[in-house]
Curated annotation (Swiss-Prot):
Record flagged with keyword Oxidoreductase: yes
Source organism (scientific name): Staphylococcus aureus (strain COL)
Keyword RNA-binding: yes
The protein's name in its UniProt record: Probable tRNA-dihydrouridine synthase
CDD domains xref list: DUS_like_FMN (cd02801)
Residue numbers binding FMN: P18, M19, E20, K143, N208, G209, D210, G232, R233
Essential cofactor(s): FMN
Gene of this entry: dus
Catalyzed reactions per annotation: a 5,6-dihydrouridine in tRNA + NAD(+) = a uridine in tRNA + NADH + H(+); a 5,6-dihydrouridine in tRNA + NADP(+) = a uridine in tRNA + NADPH + H(+)
InterPro entries: Aldolase_TIM, DUS-like_FMN-bd, DUS_fam, tRNA-dHydroUridine_Synthase_C, tRNA_hU_synthase_CS
Lineage: Bacteria, Bacillati, Bacillota, Bacilli, Bacillales
Length: 328
């Protein structure tokens, strides 16, 4: 194996969760500007497309990263071990520091085809995939859920995953069936850690689910002794979620992050052509807590270009009464 960056991380370490159509190079740089985590994962990259001579062009932009983001982990999904083997070899050549396997995506057209969380029901295939991915020489990690249908599935499923000798397990503390409709099962963290200690003491354990910020993550790490904390949806509520010393933030800071997001979208669109409308999911992160925020969000949702969005921001900020402190 090439150098295992996981062993060099602080304890606990913090990771921005991989999120489809969210954690591209643009948003990762915005998060870095606000308060960066210790590790970044890419968006989801399909191994079948990556291995296809034509499909590679449709996914290459998902793997775009810059050296200042290191350690960078490629998050990949599929169900054909040989494709994982081939992909892992190429990812190592591209400069990634690790590979993370998606065994937790709950989306129906993924899971019901035996991919993502569907691999929970195919443990033998999951094991083959893990071993095949080691061909690239990078440390292999897994992101998964407690089970597919029932919470109690975690015992057999996670035991099986721990037996595969992986670098890190990120466990989303819900089942596939639960999606994100119920509270994450923090009450299971201690038992999962005990299982890890028994089966694979050298595998790092990262928890995920309902963790809004670094402060909460530190409290959980102190209580349970886990190695890492992964924050996903919490970043939408607080782009400063990874801040080491929390402080008050203002509406101007959030709007400045939006301007940065727009600029980076322009900069990197040559690497992966994305329609402008893909930006709309982010506006609610930056525009809130000030007079006129609702109307500005509505107007931004109807813009068709970076130039239009910037013009709206210029007009809005010129009329702002004051820089308001924001509750995050």
């Amino acid at each position: 194996m090439k150098e295992n960056f996981w062993s060099e991380l602080p304890r606990p370490f913090f990771i921005l969760a991989p999120m489809e159509d969210v954690t591209d190079i643009v948003f990762r740089h915005v998060v870095s500007e606000a308060a960066r985590p210790d590790v970044f994962f890419t968006e989801f990259t399909n191994t079948e497309s990556f291995c296809h001579p034509e499909g590679i062009h449709s996914v290459r932009g998902r793997l775009t990263f810059s050296e200042d983001e290191q350690p960078m982990v490629a998050h990949i999904w599929g169900d054909k071990p040989e494709q994982f083997r081939e992909t892992s070899i190429q990812l190592a050549k591209m400069g990634f520091k690790g590979i993370d396997l998606n065994m937790g995506c709950p989306v129906a057209n993924v899971a019901k085809k035996g991919k993502g969380s569907g691999l929970i029901l195919r443990p033998d295939v999951a094991a083959e995939i893990i071993q095949a991915t080691k061909a690239g020489g990078l440390p292999v990690s897994v992101k998964t859920r407690l089970g597919y249908y029932e919470i109690d599935e975690w015992k057999d499923w996670l035991k099986h995953v721990f037996e595969q000798d992986i670098a890190n397990l990120s466990i989303h503390l819900r089942t596939r069936k639960e999606m994100s409709k119920v509270d994450a099962h923090w009450e299971l963290i201690e038992a999962i850690k005990n299982l890890r200690d028994e089966i694979a003491p050298n595998t790092l354990l990262t928890i995920n689910g309902d963790i809004p910020d670094r402060k909460t993550g530190l409290e959980l790490a102190e209580k349970y002794g886990i190695d890492g904390v992964m924050i996903g949806r919490g970043i939408f509520h607080n782009p400063f979620a990874f801040e080491k010393e929390p402080r008050e933030h203002t509406s101007k800071e959030l709007l400045d992050l939006l301007r940065l997001h727009l600029s980076l979208f322009n900069k990197y669109e040559k690497d992966e052509i994305r329609q402008f409308k893909s930006l709309r999911r982010f506006f609610k992160i930056y525009v809130r807590g000030i007079r006129g925020a609702s109307e500005l969000r509505h107007q931004l949702m109807n813009t068709q270009s970076i130039a239009e969005a910037r013009a709206l921001l210029d007009e809005f900020e010129a009329q702002m009464d004051e820089d308001v402190k924001i509750e995050l």
